Regions:
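Acidic, low-complexity intrinsically disordered segments
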Residues: 2-228
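Radical SAM enzyme core and accessory elements
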Residues: 2-28, 77-83, 110, 385-584
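Flexible glycine/acidic-rich beta-alpha junction loops that bind and position SAM and/or redox cofactors
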Residues: 13-16, 122-125, 241, 323-331, ...
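Alpha-helical structural signal in soluble globular domains
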Residues: 57, 103-107, 130-131, 245-253, ...
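Residue-level detector of anion-binding/catalytic polar loops
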Residues: 61, 112, 282, 316, ...
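Structural recognition of alpha->loop->beta junctions
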Residues: 125-143, 273, 278-284, 335-350
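Radical SAM [4Fe-4S] cluster-binding motif and immediate context
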Residues: 163-318, 323-325, 331-334, 338
Length: 584
């Protein structure tokens, strides 16, 4: 009987030791978006979604082990009787995988070791890790094929939250959301992009229709008691038919779900703001990359106007910019950093132009002899020093420029959470006004043209009423942080902005309720404790270990796992400093 373990790499994360680096924390926002924002930075870990999706869609019994510590992992190997052990990892974690594979060889010598994830593209991987099989692309179909199962069976979507161990200002107040993995890959073929190359420049849909996406939302929503979802897809709206069907399904069922997702700028323009608002998009990650407009996806688009329009309609924007591109020298890099900040996105990622194995950029730089091959893999994460020769910067300078870019954004626009709150309340005001105006003018939504059109029908837009309620809920989640944001603001302008946003909330939603006032006081208390801890260095908490088993499903009617295993995973109750985590 075959039995598969699917595991991520072991913790601690974000700790400098022989396997990893402090600047690689396994936290998306804190690591590379709200970096340098101290206690204002939202903290969370995203589960290894792919592992759950793969386990859900196999017939053989499978176990997922996410965020294990070394003891969890070794115990699982010793006691699990696994015939196959799959390890998913990114490039900087390859030395952890090496240690894990060595342990498997010793304690489960008959187990087949399968590697996958973005780290699987490392050239000469076999010289680092002792493994048997490698999946360099999409995993669900690869594993079905590998185990001789029916590749064409429908895809079942697992229930999973988008993040665990969530807090800001040290307070566990970030609300839950589900994750919906609609597809992987992107056809835009940007030269540096690991995703497009990993999936061979093709898009693979797991949920091809709007109905399938809606059903996955219903299932996850019921299990996790959420109405908010992250759509894991590089460019969800690039499949407009599916997005339109999703909206039709939500409208017919009276469900005004909200979504966070990724989109290229060109796609947003094609669908239009009215559609995005109606669909419930509340957070967009957009690759703006560089002022030099070197990528097709941003050419001819007024990004300043686009981002402002999104924010004015309640869609918070995370813009992503790239440092140390070929055209950057000591003057143009400052121009690009200033330009990226001038976009006034709520959040701003700075990522280094890193040649990641498997990408065209890596091949080009390898051929040109630009790669610095003696730089260890754990250092190749894009937030410290670059790992290639750049004619205008020393390695040390690249670390400093990167850090300083984040500091400049923080000093210029203040905490990201306040920017997001501002966009949510502005959006609520705008959309409420537009809904009222349209009713007055007798305008109704045309699902074909994706526009509001004058029809003489003055009936209220019932779905937009639900949408406004959902927008209000999204906005009010931020209310407890205002005072802490003001008290610990990085400068006077940021403190003023926190006050201004709090006043705008009061004018829009009325004075805070008793519950909101108590929550605000609690966040201030948490923030005080967090600020003391932060004085000793960054406060690094480790995610709890998540373990879930899928039974043998040979011959079973395909049925998604309904059990909400997310309430059962073991969490570390107390926050840990980086040093404590390292000792663990
Ligand atoms: S648009 Fe984004 S996901 Fe697509 S190839 Fe470019 S960087 Fe990658």
């Amino acid at each position: 009987m075959k039995k598969l373990l699917l595991t991520g790499v072991f913790k601690p994360f974000g700790v400098s030791d022989e396997y990893g680096e402090a600047l690689c924390t396994m936290e998306l926002l804190n690591n590379q978006v709200t970096r340098e924002q101290g206690i204002h930075s939202p903290r969370s870990n995203n589960p290894s979604f792919g592992l759950y999706l793969m386990a859900e869609n196999l017939e053989i019994p499978a176990t997922v082990l996410d965020f294990p510590d070394w003891e969890d992992f070794t115990k699982e190997i010793r006691n699990g009787n696994y015939t196959h052990v799959g390890i998913s990892f990114i490039v900087p974690n390859v030395l952890k995988v090496k240690r894990m594979a060595e342990y498997v060889r010793k304690h489960a010598p008959n187990a087949v070791i399968i590697l996958g994830g973005h780290g699987a593209g490392i050239p000469g991987l076999e010289e680092i890790v002792d493994y048997d099989e490698v999946c360099r692309g999409e995993g669900v179909f690869w594993l079905r094929r590998y185990f001789g199962e029916d590749v064409d069976k429908p895809i079942l979507h697992p229930v999973s939250p988008s993040a665990v161990r969530k807090y800001v200002y040290g307070a566990p107040i970030i609300s839950d959301a589900g994750i919906i993995i609609t597809g992987v890959g992107c056809q835009n073929t940007c030269r540096f992009c690991a995703t497009t190359h990993k999936f061979e420049k093709q898009y693979t849909a797991f949920l091809s229709t709007g109905k399938e996406v809606f059903d996955a939302c219903v299932k996850t929503g019921a299990a996790l008691k959420v109405e908010d979802f992250a759509l894991m897809d590089e460019n969800f709206c690039k499949s407009p038919k599916r997005a339109r069907e999703l909206l039709v399904n939500m409208e017919s069922h009276g469900k005004a779900y909200t979504f966070s997702t990724f989109s290229s700028a060109e796609t947003i323009g094609k669908l239009g703001i009215d559609f995005l608002v109606r669909l419930g998009v509340k957070f967009l990650w957009i690759g703006v990359e560089s002022k030099a407009n070197v990528f097709e996806k941003t050419q001819g688009i007024d990004l300043h106007a686009l981002i402002a329009d999104l924010q004015n309609h309640g869609i918070t924007v995370l813009a992503s910019a790239i440092l140390f591109m070929e055209h950057h020298d000591k003057q143009t890099i400052h121009e690009d950093i200033d330009w990226a900040i001038s976009l006034e996105s709520d959040l701003l990622q700075f990522m280094q132009f890193g040649p990641i194995p498997g990408t065209r950029l890596y091949k080009d730089y390898d051929a040109e002899g630009k790669l610095l091959k003696d730089i260890p893999w754990p250092k190749q994460h894009g937030q410290d020093e670059i790992w290639f020769n750049h004619p205008s910067f020393t390695l040390k300078e690249t670390a400093t420029y990167t850090r300083d870019a984040f500091i400049k954004k923080f000093q210029t626009h203040g905490p990201g959470v306040i920017n997001m709150a501002h966009s949510y309340v502005k959006g609520y005001i705008t959309v409420a006004r537009e809904v009222a105006e349209r009713q007055k003018r007798g305008m109704t939504w045309n699902a074909e043209t994706l526009r509001y059109e004058e029809t003489g029908n003055h009936a209220p837009d019932e779905f937009m009423k639900l949408r406004l309620e959902a927008m209000k809920r999204s906005a009010l989640e931020f209310r407890p942080v205002f005072k802490a944001a003001e008290l610990y603001a990085p400068n006077i302008a940021a403190a003023k902005k926190a006050r201004m946003v709090a006043e705008l909330y009061e004018a829009t939603f009325g004075p805070p309720t008793l519950t909101e006032r108590v929550q605000g006081l609690a966040v201030r208390g948490f923030a005080f404790v967090e600020s003391i801890r932060a004085k000793d260095g960054d406060v690094m908490r480790q995610p709890g270990t998540i373990r879930h088993e899928w039974p043998d499903r040979h011959g079973a009617v395909p049925q998604a796992t309904e059990e909400n295993h997310w309430v059962r995973h073991r969490e570390h109750k107390r926050p840990q400093t980086a040093a404590a985590a390292s000792r663990e």
